[in-house]
């Protein structure tokens, strides 16, 4: 346990930020899974809607620095490839 006042504040802030980051990343992962489930069910309309939502969540995670932009591009590319494979 830190004794210095600023260290106590930093510990509190870090815990709050970690909780926030976990929430954002979890929402991103859930959105990605929704796309994959829609693709598995061969539901093209649902998959396209889920892809749009997932891309939005992924981009927000990049904006806050939770995911590297190249990793995000990879996620979105793979999901788009799966969704486009349904309509072909």
From Swiss-Prot:
This protein's GO CC annotations: cytosol; small ribosomal subunit
Keyword Ribosomal protein: yes
Gene Ontology MF, one: structural constituent of ribosome
Gene3D superfamilies registered for this protein in UniProt: Ribosomal protein S20
Coiled coil location: none
Keywords tagged on the record: Ribonucleoprotein, Ribosomal protein, RNA-binding, rRNA-binding
InterPro entries in alphabetical order: Ribosomal_bS20, Ribosomal_bS20_sf
GO biological process terms on file: translation
NCBIfam families linked to this entry: S20
Function: Binds directly to 16S ribosomal RNA.
Family note: Belongs to the bacterial ribosomal protein bS20 family.
Protein name: Small ribosomal subunit protein bS20
Gene: rpsT
């Amino acid at each position: 346990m830190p004794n210095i006042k600023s260290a106590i504040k930093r510990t509190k802030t870090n815990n709050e930020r970690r909780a926030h980051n976990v929430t954002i990343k979890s929402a991103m992962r859930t959105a990605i899974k929704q796309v994959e489930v829609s693709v598995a069910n061969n539901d093209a309309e649902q998959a396209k809607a889920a892809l749009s939502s997932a891309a939005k969540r992924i981009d927000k995670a990049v904006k806050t620095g939770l995911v590297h932009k190249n990793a995000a591009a990879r996620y979105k590319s793979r999901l788009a490839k799966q969704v486009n494979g349904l309509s072909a």
